[in-house]
Swiss-Prot record:
Keywords: 4Fe-4S, Iron, Iron-sulfur, Metal-binding, Methyltransferase, rRNA processing, S-adenosyl-L-methionine, Transferase. It comes from Ralstonia nicotianae (strain ATCC BAA-1114 / GMI1000). This is 23S rRNA (uracil(1939)-C(5))-methyltransferase RlmD. The active site is at C406 (nucleophile). It comes from the Bacteria. GO terms for biological process: rRNA base methylation.
Length: 450
């Protein structure tokens, strides 16, 4: 299509595309145009590659007026690699935009404004990604094996030899991993490498669709010794993961403020950003405002990431998780840290929980809720139903709920139920910049019983 414009960019969408609006001939608002690479405040020309009746998708051609927040991307693969979408935007502006997304979703989806907007939780902009899922593909046209993230909006693998958001020692492994996979007999049968960086160990989980030969195994052992990594193998589903070499190392991360060491498997859900996780932990416990002797409930507890720090404050804590394997590991982690006397764990499907299920747990003074992207709809509906029953049922509800979210849209949906139907107020909310240079919005919110 021909070059069009000029166009004023007024905002970013949830994929970090610049958003502008055309005007009809009569001066009324027309189509919305989404422009890859454009920033709010910029005046640009663009070329559309997809046109629909109500919107167009386009690529940036020229910047006629540049945003003061535009910066030079640090990574030379930015724009091709799909791992990041906002490196061309100043870090402070990234956080401000994420805060605006959170507040807009709360207002537009739930008609809510927090009483207090919390100061954003932020940390290092680079080298923060301690977990990553890398795609592996043999591409003859590229001269061999590629290991990396997908290209932006594509199933192709980016031809990348470094990554600025991975820890430097992991970034340095990208080229050696290409060479390693190229030497294996199953070069065409290894679609993925999952990276998990612990306190002292870097684990690489190889998804293998065929057994390794003895020569393959020798290659892996030599690579592990040379690069100080630990290989795990995954022949089928996530439950089939097992350590291959070396066997005398354990993956852990630490929470120094609480004196806690957390063993984990490389396929367990753990936070990508260890530094932010520690700050988030402190903020969450401060917002819970629990007192020694309080009973606390941790929903979607995983391996005990929040449960165990809560228990160090002299509280009795119950963690509930939908995965039997994670529930078992949470209990083991409590025992490892000498907190099994302060914690109990149960496995429940929290996506199908009812008001009666919640009531059967008994009363807890404070709740912490940390769901996946789907949010906590069933839990929120159960809370609303107990509130509406009144009497003893309503008395079971906590005075405060701290909600950690990785999807502002589902947070807003659940917040609407908690406030408009369950009698809570949204006391505060703010963003957590867990994923710098991406459009991913993590946040924390506090609800207090009115």
């Amino acid at each position: 299509m021909p070059v069009a414009g000029p166009l004023e960019i007024v905002s970013l969408d949830n994929e970090a595309r610049g958003v502008g609006r055309l005007s009809n001939e009569d001066g009324t608002p027309g189509k919305v145009v989404f422009v890859e690479g454009a920033l709010p405040g910029e005046r640009v020309t663009y070329r559309s590659h997809r046109a629909k009746p109500s919107y167009e998708q386009a690529t940036l051609v020229d910047i006629l007026r540049q945003s003061a927040s535009r910066v030079t991307p640090q990574c030379r693969f930015f724009g091709t690699c799909g791992g990041c979408s906002m490196q061309h935007l100043d870090s402070r502006a990234q956080i401000a935009i994420k805060q605006r997304v959170l507040e807009d979703d709360l207002w537009h989806l739930a008609k809510l404004r927090p009483d207090v907007v919390f100061r954003p939780i932020a940390g290092p902009d680079w080298g923060y990604r301690y977990r990553a899922r890398l795609t592996v593909r043999h591409v003859a046209a590229k001269g061999g094996v590629l290991v990396g993230f997908h290209e932006r909006k594509s199933s192709y693998v980016a031809d990348m030899t470094s990554c600025e958001v991975l820890p430097p020692h992991v970034s340095a492994l990208l080229v050696p991993l290409r060479e390693l996979v190229g030497r294996l007999s199953i070069v065409q049968r290894m679609p993925q490498i999952e990276v998990a960086v612990g306190q002292d160990v870097t684990a690489l989980v190889l998804r293998i669709l065929e057994p390794l030969t003895s020569a393959d195994e020798a290659e892996l052992r030599a690579f592990a010794d040379r690069h100080a990594v630990q290989f795990w193998l995954q022949p089928k589903g996530p439950d089939t993961v097992y350590p291959f070499y070396p066997l005398d190392r354990a993956l852990t991360y630490t929470l120094p403020e609480f004196g806690i060491t957390m063993p984990f498997k490389p396929t367990d859900f753990t936070q990508v950003n260890h530094q932010i996780n520690r700050v988030l932990m402190s903020r969450a416990l401060k917002l819970l405002d629990a007192r020694p002797g309080d009973r606390l409930l941790d929903l979607f507890c995983g391996i005990g990431n929040f449960t165990l720090p809560m228990a160090t404050r002299g509280c009795e804590v119950m963690g509930i998780e939908g995965s039997e394997a994670l529930t078992t590991r949470a209990l083991a982690n409590a025992q490892h840290n000498g907190l099994d006397g302060k914690t109990t764990f149960a496995c429940r499907n929290l996506f199908e929980v009812s008001a009666d299920d919640i009531a059967a747990l008994g009363r807890f003074d404070r709740w912490l809720v940390d769901p996946p992207r789907e949010g906590a709809l069933a839990v929120s509906k159960a809370v609303a139903e107990l509130s509406q029953r009144g009497g003893e049922a309503a008395a079971l509800l906590p005075g405060r709920i701290v909600y950690v979210s990785c999807n502002p849209a589902t947070l807003a949906r659940d917040a609407g139920l908690l406030v408009h139907e369950a009698g809570y107020r949204l006391a505060g909310a703010g963003v957590v910049n867990m994923f710098p240079h991406t459009s991913h919005v993590e946040s924390i919110a506090v609800f207090e019983r009115a």
